Design a protein with these regions (language model features):
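Membrane-interfacial amphipathic/re-entrant helices at transmembrane-helix boundaries
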Residues: 1-18, 46, 54-60, 131-133, ...
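Alpha-helical transmembrane segments within multi-pass membrane transporters and channels
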Residues: 22, 55-96, 101, 143-144, ...
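Membrane-embedded helix boundary and interhelical linker motif in transport proteins
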Residues: 26-82, 123-129, 234-237, 264
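Short loop segments and helix-boundary regions at transmembrane helix junctions
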Residues: 27-32, 74-118, 123-124, 207-210, ...
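Helix-loop-helix "hairpin" substructures at the membrane interface of multi-pass membrane proteins
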Residues: 72, 132-213, 217, 221-222
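Transmembrane helix-bundle core of multi-pass membrane transporters
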Residues: 87, 91-155, 185, 209-210, ...
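Cytosolic-side transmembrane-helix boundaries in multi-pass membrane proteins
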Residues: 167-174, 178-181, 234, 239-243, ...
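Transmembrane alpha-helical segments in multi-pass inner-membrane proteins
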Residues: 194, 198-274
Length: 307
């Protein structure tokens, strides 16, 4: 059980990087970007092929996976901004095309890297720590660094314009901001993080698979919603932007812990997609029910005071 929970934490932290990417489009830009399933697998496929077929350094392979994800995001951005295709449809088109592209890149449905070195195995050899522990430590370090960089970036003029585009596109456009540029930046940045996560998880699990991105959007949304629900329990709630970013990563860890516990209790692994959908639905319903409860309680207290 302890080993399963440790593996869940390592997976949760690494997936948290992807969740941050989805957070940018889903929460900040208010765009349902469906590219992520494809760009996640793209990052993993590019990373695996470079390591296995070209003996590229694992770190450079990760950076290449991140760049590949950014290119996928740019394609979606071009379809959305230049050709004015609705964002959700543009993402679906890119996602579908990436399925064939990933197959072309690997030349087969999966590519194992069991005999090759990875970032995690290299650090494990240097430190003597188990690879599962190394994955947790490196994942936390990367997640903290990315959260800090995103917090700084979204405090800049460009980052603030990007956030304002998601809040009120017409207002920010009236102020002279090119919203097409902000959308493009957001989609490229988002999918770069998703490609980075795909490459890291590829090295963590020692293989890349054509279907490794299937359902990634559901997992990410579940993590975001879980993180927001838990973040509201903090004294300051989600008022601080840094807390919103950190809660997305924390929500990812909680999601994978829940999944590991449920699997240990004997749930069929084939039912995990159903569990993910239920978690998202429940997490979305809880804030609504809670607000209605507080509103009803305030009405009751007001009636008692008037009586």
């Amino acid at each position: 059980m302890l080993i399963a929970l440790q593996g869940a934490v390592s997976q949760g932290v690494l997936w948290g990087i992807m969740v941050l990417g989805v957070f940018i489009t889903f929460r900040l830009l208010d765009i349902p970007d469906m590219t992520c399933d494809g760009s996640f697998a793209l990052g993993g496929c590019v990373c695996a092929v470079l390591i296995v077929n070209n003996n590229v350094d694992p770190l450079l392979a990760v950076l290449a996976g991140m760049c590949a994800g950014a290119i996928a995001g740019a394609v979606t951005g071009i379809l959305t901004t230049v050709f004015e295709i609705p964002a959700i449809l543009a993402g679906i088109l890119t996602q579908i095309s990436l399925w064939s592209i990933n197959l072309r890149i690997m030349g087969k449905s999966n590519t194992p890297i069991l005999a090759k070195g990875t970032i995690f195995s290299s650090v494990s050899h240097m430190t003597g720590l188990p690879q599962s522990t190394v994955a947790i430590i490196l994942g936390i370090v990367l997640a903290v660094a990315i959260v800090a960089i995103l917090y700084w970036f979204f405090g800049t003029e460009i980052g603030s314009a990007l956030r304002a585009t998601g809040n009120n596109e017409y207002m920010i456009r009236a102020l002279g901001v090119n919203t097409n540029s902000t959308k493009m930046i957001a989609l490229v940045l988002s999918n770069a993080l998703i490609g980075l996560a795909g490459a890291l998880i590829c090295q963590s699990q020692k293989y890349a698979d054509i279907g490794m991105g299937t359902g990634a959007i559901v997992i990410s949304l579940a993590a975001i919603v879980i993180g927001e629900v838990l973040g509201r329990l903090l004294p300051g709630g989600l008022t601080q932007f840094s807390v919103r970013l950190a809660s997305a990563v924390f929500g990812s860890v909680v999601y994978f812990l829940i999944r590991a516990i449920v699997l240990q209790l004997g749930m069929d692994a084939n039912d995990m997609k159903l569990l993910s959908a239920v978690i998202v639905a429940v997490a979305l319903c809880v804030p609504v029910v809670w607000e209605r409860y507080k509103l009803r309680s305030s009405y009751t207290k007001g009636d008692e005071a008037n009586a």
